[in-house]
């Protein structure tokens, strides 16, 4: 076990200092869903009129999407949690997405759908790799081809073009080989301006897709069945502007529910749509927590002890892969043994080593972790290797004995708005420092590796 003081090498990365074993109480406000807001911003490319989005989280991923839309000629104005977008045909001067932005934000690849439908041709680099496994774009490409587009890959650039004389995509029936959220969103947006009816089978069912469909329908699209495995889209010739509120972030809500459980302190989380986190609520209740509705949110009362439960990730409505790492942190101090299986991504277990540094008893077999709960974790110097494992490190530190130092904040800032401030407001002793931090040399290689990675979850 390495203590915070066993250090010998300097890092310029900012860090969090978290003092464990402090009681939390009060209410945490949940921000708008990052994974929804990003796609809604891309969806605004489907019309020349103004699209006004409310409840947009202030995150670095939103910054990147803003830069990308500005690069291709769209007008984007941001004010706190509001975004006003307009994509005039005459202003969309570029149909090629810049490598550095697509590489930084994989979610930007969904722009290929609306840009193809609007401009008839689009070029985009292959999306940047992330540190949690392979995310093939085959489903995106096959879906666009099925709509009549010519799609090829040349020197790591995807080139998509409408080649028919009518210069419109043509509706058809498309069956995805796997439930891909990104591919469902890409093809759904493209199909709204296609000629005729498009039917998407084996479509992803995530709430963010429902949110996208709701906005598109406000814009004049005809989308039915979003949230089920079959989505029907009747194409229209043009779409109009709209005002739309981004749904609450279900992953952030789940993260703070787990924060309550791991500290054994009751919290109120609001706003929350309970149906969006049903699998998480079910598992927390099995752990011994009591959860009840409280206005537009939920109140959680952790039990005197946390019971171990097995969990397997799966696409919605199953347990979300984005909460696998925080839930493993919780199971690390649960009574008994548990098994956590990651079925969505093949390399999403980087947090195991960091939890072990804190004293967690975890053995790993490929994508399955076996956890024997310990009485308490011990504070140390740790690193979040991706967005959700960074959050897991904070939760583990809240329950640990002593003061932990956490690096990897570049990941954390991609998906959690004012994360440490929200925790401070309910009693956590947590502070961010931009200063130099001396780090344990044994973890310096991991810090270098993780700090250069990209992450979208």
Curated annotation (Swiss-Prot):
Similarity annotation: Belongs to the EPSP synthase family. MurA subfamily.
UniProt-annotated catalytic positions: 130
The keyword Methyltransferase appears for this protein: no
Naturally occurring in which organism (per UniProt): Prochlorococcus marinus (strain SARG / CCMP1375 / SS120)
Catalytic activity, reaction form: phosphoenolpyruvate + UDP-N-acetyl-alpha-D-glucosamine = UDP-N-acetyl-3-O-(1-carboxyvinyl)-alpha-D-glucosamine + phosphate
Pfam families for the chain: EPSP_synthase
Full protein name: UDP-N-acetylglucosamine 1-carboxyvinyltransferase 1
Domain of life: Bacteria
Keyword hit for Manganese: no
Gene: murA1
GO cellular component: cytoplasm
Biological classification of the source: Bacteria, Bacillati, Cyanobacteriota, Cyanophyceae, Synechococcales
């Amino acid at each position: 076990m390495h203590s915070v003081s066993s250090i010998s090498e300097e890092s310029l990365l900012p860090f969090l200092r978290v003092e464990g074993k402090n009681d939390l109480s009060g209410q945490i406000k949940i921000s708008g869903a990052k994974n929804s807001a990003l796609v809604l911003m891309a969806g605004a490319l489907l019309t020349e009129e103004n699209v006004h989005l409310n409840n947009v989280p202030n995150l670095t991923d939103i910054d990147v999407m803003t830069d990308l839309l500005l690069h291709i000629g769209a007008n984007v104005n941001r004010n706190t949690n509001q975004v006003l977008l307009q994509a005039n045909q005459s202003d969309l001067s570029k149909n090629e997405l810049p490598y550095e932005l697509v590489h930084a934000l994989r979610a930007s690849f969904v722009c290929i759908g609306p840009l193809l439908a609007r401009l008839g041709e689009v070029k985009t680099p292959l999306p940047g790799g992330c540190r949690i496994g392979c995310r093939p774009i085959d489903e995106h490409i096959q879906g666009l081809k099925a709509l009549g587009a010519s799609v090829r890959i040349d020197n790591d650039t995807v080139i998509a073009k409408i080649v028919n004389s009518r210069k419109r995509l043509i509706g058809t029936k498309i069956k995805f080989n796997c439930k891909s959220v990104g591919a469902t969103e890409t093809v759904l947006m493209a199909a709204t301006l296609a000629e005729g009816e498009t039917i998407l089978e084996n479509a992803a069912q995530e709430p963010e897709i429902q949110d996208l469909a709701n906005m598109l329908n406000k814009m004049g699209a005809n989308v039915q069945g979003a949230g089920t495995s079959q989505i029907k889209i009747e194409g229209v010739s043009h779409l109009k502007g709209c005002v739309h509120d981004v749904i609450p972030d279900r992953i952030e809500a789940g993260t703070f529910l787990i924060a309550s459980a791991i500290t054994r302190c009751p919290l109120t989380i609001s706003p929350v749509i309970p149906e969006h986190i049903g699998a998480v609520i079910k598992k927390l209740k099995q752990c011994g927590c009591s959860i009840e509705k409280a206005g537009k949110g939920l109140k959680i009362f952790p039990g005197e002890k946390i019971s171990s439960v097995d969990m397997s990730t799966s696409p919605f409505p199953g347990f979300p892969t984005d909460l696998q790492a925080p839930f493993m942190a919780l199971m690390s101090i649960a009574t008994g043994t548990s098994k956590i299986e990651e079925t969505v991504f093949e390399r999403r277990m980087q947090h195991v080593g960091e939890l072990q540094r804190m004293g967690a008893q975890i053995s790993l077999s490929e994508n399955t972790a076996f956890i024997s709960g310990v009485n308490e974790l011990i504070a140390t110097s740790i690193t979040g290797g991706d967005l959700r494992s960074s959050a897991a490190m904070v939760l583990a530190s809240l329950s640990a004995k002593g003061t932990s130092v956490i690096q990897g904040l570049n990941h954390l800032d991609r998906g959690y708005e004012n994360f440490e401030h929200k925790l401070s407001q309910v009693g956590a002793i947590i502070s961010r420092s931009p200063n130099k931090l001396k780090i344990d040399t044994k973890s310096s290689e991991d810090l270098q590796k993780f700090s250069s990675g990209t992450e979208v979850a």
